[in-house]
Structures are given as C-alpha cells and as structure tokens.
C-alpha cells in the first residue's frame, strides 16, 4: 500500500536514470510533482516534458526548490544530501526520499537487497539466476540494470536489488525480506567524511529486514538486529555451524555449510577465492529464502 499522502508538495531532484524512473512512476499514479535539475539541459529532459507539465519543470539551479514550498523530495542518488539547498530544506523538515523508498511503498512481492563496496553486481546477478533456476520469476535491478521502480510488475515472485550507499542514504526503514552487506572498504571518500560514515550508509540496508547475510571476515558488515531475526554469515575460511565457508580434504576444496560439503570448487564456474565468497553469500541467501541449495536446478547454474 502506498504511503504517499495527497497533501504533500513533491519534487523529483535530478534527471538521471533513477530520477526519470521516479518521474515515470509518479506520473503513472497520477501524482503531481515538480522536476528540478541543476543542469540547463539534462539528458532526460525531453522524456520528463512528456510526463510532467513544462511549467512544473525547472532546470539550471536547485535553489528554486526553496521557492516551490516543497515538503517531500525524491533525490537522485548522484546528488549529495550535503548540497546546500538540500541541507537547508532538510533542516526545515522537508522529507528526503529516494526511488527505493517509493519501491518499498508499492512492492507486493518479496525482495532481496544487496550492497557492498565490491561484488554486489556479481552477487545480485547470481541470486537472480539461482531463483530463476528454481522456477521463480525473479527480476534483478536497482543500481544494476533497470531502476527498481521500472521492475515493478504483476506476477513477480522475487525482486533482487543491488543498492548503492547513495541510494541507501535516502532509504528509511527498508524492510527487505532479506538484506545482505557483502563487504565495506574505502569508497566514495569524496562524498563521505570517513569510512565510518560510509559504513553507516551501507548498514541502512539492514533496517527492518526479516533476514540477513553478512561477511564473517569483515566486522563492518555485522548487523545489529532484533533478537530472532535469522542471520547467516559467510567466510572463505572454515565455517562454524550454520555458517557458509570453505573446507579442504583429500578430495580438494569444498564450499560448505558448517561441516556439510555442498559443492566442490571444480563445480563452480566462477574461479578464485573472491568468487567463492560470492557464491557462498548467494547460497546463504537462497537458503534463507526457503529454497533447496542442493537441488539439481541450483547445481546446474
């Protein structure tokens, strides 16, 4: 059910791919909004003009937002919330939201949210492929491929979203059915004051989640969750019970769950320790989604 109120004055800020997806979505729902972009002639301008009255489109300066009396902004991920006009509006109580907030309001199927400094595209793609191999209508997107709002359609069994830290900044109470933070290392330090501010943005993926997967070898991925929320950890070392990891014996190296051997590394098309970690994370997610990780369909992927 939508959480969008009818008395709000909204604007989409930025006409990149994500901003345009917000324009398309809001227009499809018959919701009034402004469009504002700091560029005089942004690449999505012509499409926006087909969906929004020209008198509600402003380009060349974001400061016009203050004159519009906005109460709710859908900010494109490429625009930092530290931008002066956005900071001033936030101080006045204007809601700073993003496309993933909109997605969450309207999605009617389970969704998986995946982030990390590295490998998030690989793992997002792999989880979607594994779900499809199990006969599920799974759609992948977000920061990868199609924007999340463009994925929404009937008869979808699962959505698998790659999310960037920029997207998570404007996401409040994500409530993913399954959230995964793969790793955290210094990235986008031109946007964040330090590693820990960046980590805090990444950690927002866990807010309200029903289950989680984290990296045992990276303490910055460890979630703080309510008691009873299922969590699976993965590691490229020997795993503890219920963890996913690697074991070696006379037959070679194995991907394992606890002491249970799952797949020999020779069966894995993706080679190298980093890719084994990606596969382990994906298997942990498939288990938490209630599917058989040892099925013939999974083994063939």
Language model: regions and residue ranges:
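Short, hydrophobic beta-strand segments that form beta-sheet elements in well-ordered domains
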Residues: 12, 33-37, 57-58, 73-75, ...
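Cofactor-binding loop segments of dinucleotide-utilizing enzymes, especially the Rossmann-like FAD-
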Residues: 15, 38, 116-117, 143, ...
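Short, surface-exposed amphipathic charged segments that create phosphate/polyanion-binding patches used
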Residues: 70-76, 110-116, 242-255
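N-terminal leader/targeting and accessory segments in enzymes
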Residues: 1-98, 102, 271, 291
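Phosphate-binding loop of NTP-binding sites
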Residues: 27, 65-68, 77-230, 284, ...
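Adenine nucleotide phosphate-binding catalytic loops in nucleotide-utilizing enzymes
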Residues: 8, 13-15, 194-196, 230-301
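Short, solvent-exposed loop/turn elements at beta->coil junctions and helix N-caps
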Residues: 62, 166, 299-300
């Amino acid at each position: 059910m939508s959480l969008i109120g009818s008395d709000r004055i909204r604007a989409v800020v930025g006409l990149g791919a994500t901003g345009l997806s917000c324009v398309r979505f809001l227009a499809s729902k018959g919701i009034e909004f402004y469009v504002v972009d700091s560029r005089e002639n942004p690449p999505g301008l012509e499409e926006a003009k087909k969906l929004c009255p020209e008198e509600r489109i402003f380009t060349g300066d974001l400061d016009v937002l203050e004159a519009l009396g906005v109460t709710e902004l859908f900010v494109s991920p490429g625009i930092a919330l530290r931008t002066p006009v956005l900071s001033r509006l936030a101080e006045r109580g204007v809601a700073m939201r993003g496309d993933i907030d909109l997605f969450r309001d309207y999605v009617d199927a389970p969704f998986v949210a995946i982030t990390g400094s590295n490998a998030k595209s690989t793992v997002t793609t792999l989880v979607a492929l594994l779900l499809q191999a199990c006969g599920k209508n799974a759609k992948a997107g977000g920061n990868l491929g199609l924007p999340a709002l463009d994925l929404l359609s009937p008869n979808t069994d699962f959505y698998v979203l790659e999310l960037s830290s920029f997207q998570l900044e404007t996401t409040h109470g994500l409530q993913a059915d399954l959230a995964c933070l793969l790793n955290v290392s210094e990235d986008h330090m031109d946007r964040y004051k330090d590693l820990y501010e960046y980590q805090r943005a990444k950690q927002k993926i866990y807010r309200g989640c029903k289950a989680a997967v984290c990296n045992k070898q990276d303490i910055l991925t460890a979630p703080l969750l309510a008691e009873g929320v299922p969590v699976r950890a993965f590691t490229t070392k020997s795993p503890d019970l219920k963890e996913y990891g690697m074991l070696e014996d006379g037959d070679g190296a194995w991907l394992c769950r606890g002491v249970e051997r799952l797949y020999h590394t020779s069966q894995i098309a993706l080679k190298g320790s980093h890719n084994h970690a990606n596969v382990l994370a994906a298997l942990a997610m498939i288990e938490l989604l209630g599917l058989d990780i040892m099925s013939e369909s999974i083994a063939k992927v």
